[in-house]
Amino acid sequence: VRIILMSLLDKVNMSLSLYHYKGLGIFWVDSIMDQYIIKGGMSLAGEVTVSGAKNAALGILAAAIMTDEEVLIDNLPDVKDINVMLEAIAQTGVYVDRINRNKVKINASKLHSCVVDDEYIRRIRASYYLIGALLGKYHKAEVALPGGCEIGARPIDQHLKGFRALGANIDISSGRINASSDKLKGAHIFLDIVSVGATINIMLAASLIPGKTVI
């Protein structure tokens, strides 16, 4: 049996030889570029703990700073992007209590800055969600251009198009995005390409403003 698992996020060029799982089975894994070829045929048994979804968690963390109420998030994956996002949020004045590796308590009632330090933002691409969250709640945000991505050229023009449609003024200079508006309002937004990230970001920005937004 050959099972090919396509990885859209990681470009891997390595070969993994025989893999033993608790002595109950052996299978051969060969990884070339962006696919894994698994040749089975042996019995496998064991337990695997499935962590929370990283991409969903990043959007939820951004949404958590849009309320002054305490937010408790459980089953967070313990990965770099999540840890950096929590550091970036805490830097703005948000109270972040890391209860354990997979649970965090957030309270943004004392958020005092809409400027996010470059130190955090350039390390993860999903930091752009903070633009939508801060813009939607406080009508301003200053964030470095996001990093942490090597999957070709992935501009955030659709995000900015959505923010502008909601009434935001966008200025990009010296590697930073400045978004602000005296009055945001709902709008009909047509994305030029299908973009999950842009959709989430626009939803964040539109969630607390008057009027209906259609994407």
Language-model features, listed with the residues they occupy:
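Intrinsically disordered, low-complexity polar segments enriched in Ser/Thr/Pro and acidic
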Residues: 6-7, 136
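Structural preference for solvent-exposed beta-strand-turn elements
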Residues: 14-215
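Glycine-centered signal
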Residues: 7-9, 18
